[in-house]
């Protein structure tokens, strides 16, 4: 029983359901919302890591490409998106890097917030999975993250500040089934 659970928690390859979502038609993926009961259950689920073998796969490359295309599409126009928001319960996020020249979107597999500094600051947040709502959330302005480099497959640590740090915290929360509304200081 324990072995089966360990395998279930640490998949070694993409499931058929994941492949179907990743390789679905079009470059824009459907964004799950809390308005749909089934979607809401997915959004409240914890995510599994992505293995090195999976990071080398065409499915991962397609997923990364489609996540960026989805979050930047005119229908969404977001600054970040996480695996569960497109139906993939894996630890992967795409984040717009406002701390880098040109504000590029970058994809981070197996990302985790591992440290924070300073005090939290309250700021407005919204979410692609909670359309039409915004609220004030207290977040750290300085964090450290770790993620798996797709070039070396080693854990990489990065220190991030400002609005980009807020985006990472929001997206990493999604990977643990947490929505920004769980922290709300005021919903409009």
Placement of each model-derived feature along the sequence:
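Bacterial N-terminal signal peptides
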Residues: 1-6
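Positively charged
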Residues: 8-188
């Amino acid at each position: 029983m324990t072995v089966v659970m360990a395998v279930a928690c640490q998949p070694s390859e993409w499931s058929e359901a994941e492949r179907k979502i990743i390789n679905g038609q079009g470059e824009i993926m459907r964004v799950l919302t809390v308005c749909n009961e089934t979607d809401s259950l997915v959004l409240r689920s914890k995510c599994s890591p992505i293995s090195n073998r999976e990071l080398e796969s065409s499915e991962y490359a397609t997923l990364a490409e489609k996540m960026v295309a989805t979050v930047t599409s005119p229908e969404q126009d977001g600054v970040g998106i996480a695996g569960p928001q497109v139906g993939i319960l894996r630890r992967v996020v795409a984040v717009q890097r406002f701390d880098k020249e040109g504000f590029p979107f970058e994809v981070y597999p197996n990302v985790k917030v591992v440290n924070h500094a300073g005090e939290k600051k309250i700021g407005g947040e919204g979410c692609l999975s909670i359309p039409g709502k915004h609220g004030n959330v207290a977040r750290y302005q300085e964090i450290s993250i770790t993620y798996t480099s797709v070039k070396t497959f080693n854990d990489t640590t990065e220190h991030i500040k400002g609005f980009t740090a807020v985006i990472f915290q929001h997206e990493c929360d999604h990977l643990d089934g947490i929505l920004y509304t769980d922290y709300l200081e005021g919903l409009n």
